[in-house]
Swiss-Prot record:
Protein name: Cytadherence high molecular weight protein 3
Ranges of Polar residues composition bias in the record: 220-236
GO process annotations (BP): adhesion of symbiont to microvasculature
Gene name linked to the record: hmw3
The organism's taxonomic lineage, starting at the top: Bacteria, Bacillati, Mycoplasmatota, Mycoplasmoidales, Mycoplasmoidaceae
UniProt keywords, alphabetically: Cell membrane, Cell projection, Cytadherence, Membrane, Virulence
Region (Disordered): 220-241
Length: 599
């Protein structure tokens, strides 16, 4: 196999490896090549032993020739099972099957066999065939696994007392020729001659003795183990003065083993004493604690007079508690007032919404009285009205017939006597409008106002030639107008129509720059080509045409709260708002969020 073929196989292997790892991440796959150097991803069914090609998703024949990727060695999927003759625990000759791949023994029936007591024909235990890392049948010796505590002294706290511990360790240890350890042993020597009382006062010896015991056992490591083990190998204890001279003295150590065995049992005896001494130390620590307790008892004594003063403080805030609801009540009253005025302030500058806001007020006041007045007037005054004033009507445009009735002194006197106020608008049986006036000037003013109300005349024609009761408010005399800032110019100026165009800017108007007095091109308004026709709220932000804003800032269903609207969550949106022009350019660009602004 040349390098070119190897490179081709390696490229195909890397490509197949990514594909198989993505599709079968949890399957153990064997990669091999056939005699045509085509790479295969192979999987063997553990139960049936059949071989499958994962990339082709089909089963391969058992004798299909397969080779390793980088060599000509054939790959065999047959189990490596060897038959052995062995002797069981009763010394009977048995045939055993050894699976070299799985490293297990089986009997003739295919069951896993425990070969702990089996030997082969050469009397070699069958356990030796198994690797100790894969089976638990063979117990590893300590030589196979060095202990974690190698090179450290074994301190058995509970099994034997300290006296026996030190005698065994020190007899094996070598004598301290340079007497370096004697300086460490000095704190122990005065304890032999001291009594318990004198020893208790120091309170330090337990910690000194623990350090002394650890340091005193250091020479054991030099001789008991191999000479390579020293304190340089132990992580925690590295006293340099003890270690290095001990290594230098090793040849002379053997001559004085018995000299130091005798004095050190004397040191052992006080080591038994610190155990009760430690108990005394704990008792000494307990004694000052009750001395602190009376101090703790005195603290609540100081608190008791403080508790007496607390109710006096409670008496003072009681009137304060009474004042709090009084202060809260005007706050609660003021909040709904602010909420009521906020929508009214927003609605008034909108010309479209002015009419529906003003109209409902006179409905409740005058409609029931209008219905009651014809009962008094119809019988006496109808024939006179029709004969005298019908040929004089000057309103042919809208099909709306208006009849002017002069007031008679007798009728006014009869109504004043009964305490009944006459109304200005009356409904007749012929669905006509009767306007009663007291002077010729007011008559001309009312007719002038009616002539210029094209919207109201269209509504009257669409509703069977009858003006709706909600529109009567515009026919009242000036002294009964609803006081709004639109009342005078709205009905007296004949040059202005009632559409929203009266309040809107010119459609082609674009504000000049405040810097160089230059009017930008209309193309700067491509984000919203009705930017200059923002209705009645030309906010400062609208002078920056490239900023995206909702297309109708102030006019979103202001005649009704869109939160309470039954269609607020539906996809249906009104195509035309009341009293708005169909040419205002805004309607052609519907908003994506028509009602979301209310939230």
């Amino acid at each position: 196999m040349n390098d070119k073929q190897k490179a081709k196989i390696n490229k195909a292997y890397n490509k197949l490896l990514k594909k198989i790892n993505k599709r079968y991440p949890d399957v153990s796959v064997v990669y091999a090549r056939d005699h045509k150097n085509k790479v295969h991803a192979l999987y063997q069914d553990p139960e049936s032993g059949n071989i499958f090609s994962l990339e082709k998703r089909k089963q391969l024949a058992s004798n299909y020739p397969l080779f390793e990727l980088t060599s000509d060695n054939p790959i065999s999927f047959t189990n490596n099972i060897v038959s052995l003759n062995a002797y069981d625990d009763k010394n009977n000759l048995v045939t055993v099957q050894y699976d070299q791949d799985n490293n297990t023994f089986y009997d003739q029936n295919g069951n896993v066999l425990d070969v702990s007591s089996y030997t082969d024909e050469k009397k070699v235990p069958l356990i030796n065939y198994l690797s100790s890392t894969q089976t638990s049948q063979e117990q590893p010796t300590q030589q196979d696994y060095p202990s974690i505590d190698a090179g450290l002294p074994k301190i058995e706290v509970d099994d034997q007392p300290k006296a026996a511990q030190h005698t065994t360790l020190e007899t094996e240890s070598e004598p301290d020729v340079f007497e370096l350890n004697d300086s460490l042993n000095q704190p122990q020597q005065p304890t032999e001659n001291l009594g318990d009382d004198q020893f208790v006062e120091k309170e330090v010896p337990p910690t000194q003795q623990l350090h002394q015991d650890l340091v005193h056992q250091q020479p054991v490591q030099v001789d008991s183990g191999s000479q390579n083990h020293s304190f340089n190998n132990s992580p925690s204890l590295k006293p340099p003065l003890v270690n290095k001279p001990a290594k230098l003295v090793q040849p002379e150590v053997k001559h004085i083993p018995q000299v130091e065995v005798q004095p050190k049992p004397q040191i052992v005896e006080p080591k038994i004493e610190p155990k009760p001494e430690v108990k005394h130390v704990s008792h000494v620590e307990i004694q000052p604690k009750p001395e602190v307790k009376p101090v703790v008892d005195s603290v609540p004594e100081v608190k008791q007079p403080e508790v007496k003063h607390v109710p006096h403080v409670e008496v003072q805030p009681k009137p304060v508690v009474d004042l709090k609801p009084q202060r809260i009540e005007p706050r609660i009253e003021s909040k709904p007032e602010v909420i009521k005025h906020i929508p009214q302030v927003e609605v008034q500058p909108k010309a479209q919404m002015v009419e529906p806001r003003i109209e409902p007020k006179p409905e409740t006041k005058y409609i029931p009285q209008v219905e009651s007045t014809p009962q008094v007037e119809v019988h006496h005054w109808k024939p006179e009205v029709k004969t005298e004033y019908q040929p004089q009507q000057p309103l042919p445009t809208s099909g709306l017939q208006i009849k002017v009735v002069p007031r008679s002194a007798a009728l006014l006197q009869s109504k004043l006597d009964t305490g009944f106020q006459p109304r200005q608008v009356e409904r007749t049986t012929d669905s006509d409008i009767t306007v009663s006036v007291s002077s010729h000037a007011s008559l001309l003013e009312k007719i002038n106002a009616l002539n210029h109300q094209r919207i109201m005349s269209d509504i009257a024609l669409k509703s069977d030639n009858t003006i709706k009761s909600s529109n009567f408010s515009r026919f009242y005399p000036e002294n009964e107008y609803v006081a709004t800032k639109y009342s005078d110019p709205l009905y007296s100026d004949t040059n202005q129509s009632l559409t929203s165009d009266r309040f809107s800017l010119d459609f082609d108007y674009t504000p000049k720059s405040r810097v160089n007095n230059y009017t930008p091109l209309r193309s700067t308004n491509f984000q919203n080509n009705a930017i200059s026709n923002y209705r009645f709220s030309r906010t400062p932000s609208s002078y920056y045409p490239l900023t995206r804003r909702p297309w109708r800032l102030t006019n979103i269903s202001s005649y009704r709260s869109s939160f309470h609207s039954p269609t607020r969550l539906s996809s249906f949106r009104r195509t035309s708002l009341p009293f708005s022009s169909s040419y205002d350019g805004l309607r052609r660009y519907p908003s994506r969020s028509y009602w979301s602004k209310d939230f």
